């Protein structure tokens, strides 16, 4: 009998990681991962584009700071099934979301780099920093994971576009290489994800995810292709868990991350409640940052139309970068408006744009239909100053904002927003009072 490529039953074998060390072979044993640094370098090297690639380890609680952070990735590999993890970047592009993955729980691959050519305007990378300990650590994504850090330096004459493409390949290959150390092992725990039939009287819920897409350095990839021109698309939640979405957005420290897509807390919570108090129907993704008001309204109606055709009664929404960059917010609000007008009750999780004291408008755009908004605070909220650190990975200097001069990366540091702070706060469940 032919394999059913559309089964969408995904098993995830989780191997917990408490410690990583460099050794003569790559091997997992009892929560510890030994890494052959030379073998890992050989697996991901692209000397024509990346002239120098350094690999470091960073553990929670260390007096360590990571600078020039571009993205974070979950180490996982497909050990059974015909598709691949992170489909589209290598391997087949047949639908992901089934088979068995092995995941290194509590670990991440982090890529740090600066681009070779000068940039300006909106399509520019913005400094992102992670402190592994101290007062800022709770508000830094991946400060609580054991991290393999790739520090990449471009070869002479390489363009920003070619360097960026190589960084994507390097981080994803590293993630797969590390997880494959467990391929022949039996996982301590196995999590199974499938949208099994449930009580038809439960509320029918769809998750609507607005992706960020502007151009190079501010984009999201779906099955290996950027989402410029993407029409609203239906995904099985397992496709997200399998790495169908990959981050290429470096515009803000609060940016989305590939790790956040594969560990999407909205998807995980809806799965947890599937069959208990909700009937989780699936995920609708669409592109934010449409080019005109007409296209923003069109996008909203197309997203709502797809949710309605699924039979959704409720939509739960979120957006990359929190959804409140001025342009993105309009797209976000138009989707809420369209869903509500199509009879779909809509709850949206988003960041605020105002100051903590309430002196600025909370959001830059608003529609009356948006009557169930959940705030995870704003960009400049909950950004405690950090003391000096003993070790820095990624560079000798840091530039907290474009208005400031570079400074010693190991010294005391104040930033507008730590890496991944918005989705970290949402993950922590901070309330408006807390934030």
Task: Pin down the residues of each PLM region.
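Long, compositionally biased, glycine/small-hydrophobic-enriched stretches that function as flexible linkers
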Residues: 1-227, 416, 427-435
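Small-residue-enriched flexible segments
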Residues: 193-290, 403-434
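Hydrophobic beta-strand scaffold residues
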Residues: 280, 346-347
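A general structural motif
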Residues: 291-307
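Proline-aspartate-enriched helix->loop->beta-strand connector
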Residues: 311-316
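Charged helix-capping and loop-helix junction motifs
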Residues: 330-335
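Long, compositionally biased intrinsically disordered regions
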Residues: 342, 348, 369-435
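Glycine-rich, charge-decorated loop segments at or immediately adjacent to ligand/cofactor-binding or catalytic sites
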Residues: 349-371
């Amino acid at each position: 009998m032919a394999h059913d490529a559309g089964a969408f039953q995904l098993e995830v074998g989780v191997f917990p990681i408490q410690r990583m060390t460099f050794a003569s072979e790559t091997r997992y044993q009892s929560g510890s991962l030994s890494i052959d640094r030379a073998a890992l370098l050989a697996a991901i090297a692209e000397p024509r584009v990346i002239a120098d690639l350094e690999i470091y380890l960073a553990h929670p609680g260390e007096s360590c700071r990571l600078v020039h952070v571009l993205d974070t990735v979950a180490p996982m590999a497909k050990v059974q099934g015909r598709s691949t993890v992170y489909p589209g970047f290598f391997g087949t592009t047949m639908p992901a979301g089934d088979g068995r993955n092995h995941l290194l729980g509590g670990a991440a691959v982090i890529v740090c780099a600066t681009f070779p050519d000068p940039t300006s305007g909106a399509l520019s990378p913005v400094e992102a920093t992670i402190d592994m300990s101290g007062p800022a650590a709770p508000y830094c994504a991946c400060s609580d994971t054991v991290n393999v850090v790739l520090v990449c330096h471009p070869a002479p004459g390489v363009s920003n576009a070619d360097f960026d493409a190589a960084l994507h390949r390097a981080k994803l290959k590293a993630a797969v290489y590390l997880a494959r150390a467990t391929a022949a092992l039996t996982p301590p725990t196995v999590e199974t994800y499938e949208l099994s039939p449930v009580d038809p009287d439960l509320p029918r819920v769809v998750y609507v995810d607005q992706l960020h897409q502007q151009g190079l350095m501010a984009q999201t990839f779906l099955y290996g292709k950027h989402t410029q021109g993407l029409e609203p698309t239906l995904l099985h939640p397992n496709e997200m868990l399998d790495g169908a979405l990959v981050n290429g957005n470096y515009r803000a420290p609060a940016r989305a991350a590939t790790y956040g897509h594969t560990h999407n807390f909205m998807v995980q919570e809806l799965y947890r409640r599937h069959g208990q108090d909700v009937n989780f129907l699936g995920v609708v993704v669409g592109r934010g940052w449409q080019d005109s008001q007409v296209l923003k309204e069109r996008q909203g109606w197309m997203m709502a139309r797809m949710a309605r055709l699924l039979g959704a009664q409720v939509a739960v929404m979120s957006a990359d970068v929190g959804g409140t960059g001025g342009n993105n917010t309009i797209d976000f609000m138009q989707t809420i408006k369209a869903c509500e007008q199509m009879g779909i009750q809509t709850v949206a999780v988003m960041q605020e744009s105002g100051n903590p004291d309430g002196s600025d408008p909370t959001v830059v755009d608003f529609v009356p239909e948006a009557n169930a908004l959940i705030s995870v605070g704003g960009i400049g909220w909950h950004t405690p100053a950090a003391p000096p650190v003993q070790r820095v990975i990624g560079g000798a200097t840091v530039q907290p904002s474009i208005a400031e001069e570079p400074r010693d990366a190991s010294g005391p540091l104040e930033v507008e927003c730590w890496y991944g702070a918005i989705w970290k706060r949402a993950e922590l469940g901070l309330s408006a009072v807390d934030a």
